[in-house]
């Protein structure tokens, strides 16, 4: 647990590497025809899970002095995927592992075995792979075959990314979304990273929102990269942007890409719409001014931003709305319920209507104990809520932050905040 007071952070902080970008770059490097070096200033439990799993699939992966050296190796007779609690690792690597190994053991921890893998498993079964059971831990048998893949687009975009990353190993493949593709920016991040490593993906976008297709041509192969830079992470930069908006004290985040395709870059517009100023100086972004206008956000394309936006909403007088959050029920926790409970526990007012959430902010919370339900993004939200709390906030399961941002509390204190283990 951690206890967080309302001491205000301000100043300049370096961005941490984008987890979504790092996962994809590491996988491309492990599948390449030559070694790669990837610049990664920090790691996390989720990134470690991907590196461990790539080792289990035959790659030689060494992380030293903020550089990952990836040397592709022959796939073992039996592969081993160890995603721990990382849904991204699991979903991206299931088809990748099946594209290079005849047999693969797959483990999982925490809530991960209960997170959805359909319709991807069904498509893999239709293309040559069998599973000992329908949720991990399980063993996959049979090599994934290329061809036509079709899936709904409203469960997880990671299914599309995983099949795209596997495609160069299995020949000509087309992956089609039979319903509108949600979190499509993450698929764009996948195709851009694949292009960086030498594989061009053909993207066909019809006039309607369905039958969006991605094709990887026959003969495509990944090539290694030297000193490949992982860009700054927007989902974690959002913590600092929201902190600035809640307190009115400026915070600058260095090493960010204004033109990133990361879905959570949308937090910039959220801050502007809430009345803050967002200014750029090269790759540094600064947020100034206290947020004053209620938030009205569609969660379909940025579901991971709900927890920190909920904290921001608590600091703004009036009703903020967060709609279309169905997929948040399938995260590390049921995030709609968990966020609502956290707001209530700390003295805020919130209303749930189906998959929508409405927060009636007053600018002040009482504080007290909040349950982060072993969800790293709830830890971020609870820490932010302490900024407007009358008494300290005690966060249960605060160690969950190591999933994505192990040094978070150290950085928080570095900028003048006060978070202490209890």
Name each model-derived stretch.
Residues 1-422:
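Short, structured segments at the rim of ligand-binding sites
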């Amino acid at each position: 647990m951690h206890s967080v007071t309302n001491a205000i952070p301000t100043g300049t902080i370096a961005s941490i590497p984008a987890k979504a970008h790092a996962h994809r770059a590491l996988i491309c490097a492990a599948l390449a025809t030559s070694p790669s070096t990837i610049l990664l200033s920090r790691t996390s439990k989720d990134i470690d899970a991907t590196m461990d799993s790539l080792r289990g699939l035959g790659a030689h992966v060494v992380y030293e002095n903020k550089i990952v050296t990836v040397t592709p190796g022959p796939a073992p007779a039996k592969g081993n995927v160890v995603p721990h609690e990382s849904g991204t690792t699991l979903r991206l690597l299931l088809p990748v592992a099946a594209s290079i190994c005849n047999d693969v053991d797959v483990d999982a921890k925490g809530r991960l075995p209960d997170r959805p893998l359909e319709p991807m498993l069904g498509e893999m079964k239709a293309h040559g792979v069998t599973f000992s059971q329908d949720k991990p831990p399980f063993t996959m048998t049979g090599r994934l075959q290329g061809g036509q893949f079709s899936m709904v687009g409203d469960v997880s975009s990671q299914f599309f990314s995983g099949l795209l990353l596997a495609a160069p190993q299995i020949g000509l493949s087309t992956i089609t979304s039979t319903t509108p593709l949600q979190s499509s920016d993450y698929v764009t991040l996948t195709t851009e990273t694949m292009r960086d490593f030498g594989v061009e993906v053909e993207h066909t976008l019809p006039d309607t929102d369905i039958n969006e297709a991605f094709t990887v041509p026959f003969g495509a192969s990944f090539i290694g990269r030297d000193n490949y830079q992982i860009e700054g992470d927007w989902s974690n930069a959002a913590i600092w942007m929201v902190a600035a908006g809640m307190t009115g004290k400026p915070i600058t985040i260095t090493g960010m890409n204004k033109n990133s395709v990361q879905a959570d870059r949308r937090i910039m517009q959220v801050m502007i719409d809430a009345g803050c100023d967002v200014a750029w100086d090269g790759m540094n972004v600064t947020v100034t001014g206290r947020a004053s206008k209620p938030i009205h956000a569609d969660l379909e394309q940025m579901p991971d931003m709900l927890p920190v936006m909920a904290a921001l909403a608590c600091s703004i007088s009036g009703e903020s709305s967060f709609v279309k959050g169905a997929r948040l029920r399938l995260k590390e926790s049921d995030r709609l319920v968990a966020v609502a409970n956290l707001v209530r526990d700390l003295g805020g007012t919130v209303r749930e209507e189906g998959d929508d959430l409405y927060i009636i902010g007053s600018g002040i919370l009482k504080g007290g104990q909040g349950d982060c339900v072993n969800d790293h993004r709830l830890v971020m939200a609870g820490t932010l809520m302490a900024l407007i709390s009358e008494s300290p906030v005690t966060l249960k399961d605060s160690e969950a932050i190591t999933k994505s941002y192990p040094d978070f509390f150290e950085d928080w204190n570095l900028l003048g905040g006060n978070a202490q283990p209890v």
